[in-house]
UniProtKB/Swiss-Prot annotation:
Cofactor(s) named in the record: pyridoxal 5'-phosphate
Keyword Protein transport set for record: no
Gene name linked to the record: hisC1
InterPro entries, A to Z: Aminotrans_II_pyridoxalP_BS (IPR001917), Aminotransferase_I/II_large (IPR004839), HisP_aminotrans (IPR005861), HistidinolP_aminotransfase (IPR050106), PyrdxlP-dep_Trfase (IPR015424), PyrdxlP-dep_Trfase_major (IPR015421), PyrdxlP-dep_Trfase_small (IPR015422)
Cited Gene3D superfamilies: Aspartate Aminotransferase, domain 1, Type I PLP-dependent aspartate aminotransferase-like (Major domain)
Protein family per UniProt: Belongs to the class-II pyridoxal-phosphate-dependent aminotransferase family. Histidinol-phosphate aminotransferase subfamily.
The protein's name: Histidinol-phosphate aminotransferase 1
Catalytic reaction list: L-histidinol phosphate + 2-oxoglutarate = 3-(imidazol-4-yl)-2-oxopropyl phosphate + L-glutamate
Length: 353
């Protein structure tokens, strides 16, 4: 076949998401960090209230209704909010707007692998700087890299640790480029870096409704940053990038904080119990402030356990890459799902003895 693609696209690898079985398949799905509980009843009611006029017309181009809801929730002005078709779109917008040919896009590893994919799409240079141990951010090296864009996920994936606020503040103060703080999992954490946005014009904070709000299928996220920074991002975003239904449902979801907080509390309690039970099975379990656990199984058999669990219709995440090949990432499910997983692991470990 004739090669129709740009050289950077031809050379890049595709992003590999967690396995998504067809709807209705009977599996225990603990591989994509989805919330095990349903969306807010208010969000579901908003879907039923959609009328034909909403679908006939183009949506409001900036998601104004949702921007106002975020403004009220976080206590920031409305013009400090940008809305995207999932938080991944906002990551892509930042790279399109800010990555320069003469300066690298920089981030610590291991982290969210989509940063590499999105950067390669734009043919920008990449500098990956290893974490020291699993949770010690290489602050000085990140600053010395002089990146046009620096990505920091906090809580990080796949580790689940929160980056200390002092480290983020130092980066915000000393980086000459844009600092993107990806808070996709912040609903399950004890702290946020939101205050840095108001103090530093080069910082954008990015969040999603996929995790804490159980709306991964909706595809809606948002960023918070200085209006001067956002105005540059608006220049390169797609027109009508967020559909009207998504905005209405998302607005209903984030105004129902009581429901979200109750679901998050259940996930956090289950996270604690699951970590304890995995340790009793001989797993090394890293401290997590996300809705998943990074684990190292006994006997160095991560890939074996992943494959055997898959045959039992239990999906978890295995990353065949340096530093992670002996580890498994497990999404926190309901207590019932977690117990089924634990029993399957007990059986598999006993069969290997």
């Amino acid at each position: 076949m004739t090669n129709y693609f740009r050289s950077n696209v031809e050379a890049m690898a595709s992003y590999v998401p967690g396995e998504q079985p067809p709807q209705g398949t009977q599996v225990i799905k603990l591989n994509s960090n989805e919330n095990p509980y349903p969306p807010s009843p208010e969000a579901l009611a908003a879907i039923k209230d959609i009328d034909g006029e909403c679908l006939r017309r183009y949506p409001e181009p900036f998601g104004e209704e949702f921007r106002k809801a975020v403004s009220q929730l976080l206590g920031v002005p409305c013009n400090w909010v940008i809305v995207g078709n999932g938080s991944d779109e906002i990551l892509s917008i930042v790279i399109r707007a800010c990555a320069e040919p003469t300066r690298k896009v920089v981030y610590p590893v291991p982290t969210y692998v989509l940063y590499r994919t999105l950067t390669e799409m734009q043919a920008a240079d990449i500098l990956e700087i290893p974490y020291r141990e699993y949770n010690i951010l290489p602050v000085a090296d990140l600053i010395a890299a002089h990146g046009s864009v620096t990505f920091i996920a906090s809580p990080n994936s796949p580790s689940g640790h929160v980056v200390p606020s002092d480290d983020l503040r130092k980066l915000a103060s000393e980086l000459s480029g844009v600092l993107v703080i990806d808070e996709a999992y912040v609903d399950f954490a004890e702290e946020s870096a939101l205050n840095l946005v108001q103090d530093h014009e080069n910082v954008i904070l990015i969040r999603t409704l996929s995790k804490g709000y159980s709306l991964a299928g909706l595809r809606l996220g948002f960023g918070v940053g200085n209006p001067q920074l956002l105005n540059g991002l608006f220049k390169v975003k797609d027109s009508y990038n967020v559909d009207a239904i998504a905005c209405k449902v998302a607005t209903a979801a984030i105004t129902d904080q009581a429901y979200k907080n109750a679901c998050v509390a259940k996930v956090k309690a289950s996270r604690t119990r699951l970590a304890k039970d995995l340790k009793q099975l001989g797993f090394c379990v890293w401290d997590s402030q996300a809705n998943f656990l990074l684990t190292q199984p006994p006997q160095g058999n991560a890939e074996y356990l992943y494959q055997q669990l898959r045959e039992k219709k239990i999906l978890i995440r295995y990353f065949k890459q340096p530093g992670l090949e002996d580890k498994l990432r497990i999404t926190v499910g309901t207590d019932e799902q977690n117990q089924i997983l634990l029993q399957a692991l007990r059986d598999l470990l006993e069969s290997r003895d």
